[in-house]
Amino acid sequence: MKVWVDADACPGVTKETLFRAADRAEIETILIANHSVRIPPSRFIKMVTVSSGFDVADDEIVKRLTAGDLVITADIPLAAEVIEKGGLALNPRGELYTEQNIKSILNMRDFMDTMRASGVQTGGPAAMSQSERQAFANQLDRLITKFKQQKK
């Protein structure tokens, strides 16, 4: 399992959690973004910079992803592609996207896009809470533990 990070919009606290997990579990973690992201020195953490453009980083993640890999993203259409390709998708707030929930999440996203297009002010997401940070760390740990057990 590799961990792919949609790093363009990934919160700093999430990246810090990922960096610690990569070194602790010795899991290859690759950040993909259209700008350089500072990463700590580690043999398990890499940065890939792609050209600017709509969904260029997302497309690169999907291209490189193999079944069983984990993608960290808040981008719901990207999460749907990851699941379709046999990967796992986790958002920075600790919500695991699955075959069972991705369609309803996509539908809600599309509904909110329609509302915004018609002039309704929907606001953005709230700042990440401590409980969401903890939920992410816990879910990441569960996924890594499960992978390590299957690998034995």
Swiss-Prot record:
Q: Which family does it belong to?
A: Belongs to the UPF0178 family.
The record ties this protein, via HAMAP family, to: UPF0178 (MF_00489)
Species name:
Shewanella piezotolerans (strain WP3 / JCM 13877)
Pfam families given in the database record: DUF188 (PF02639)
Q: Where do the TM regions start and end?
A: none
Source organism, top-level taxon? Bacteria
The record ties this protein, via CDD domains, to: PIN_YqxD-like (cd18720)
* Record's protein name: UPF0178 protein swp_1285
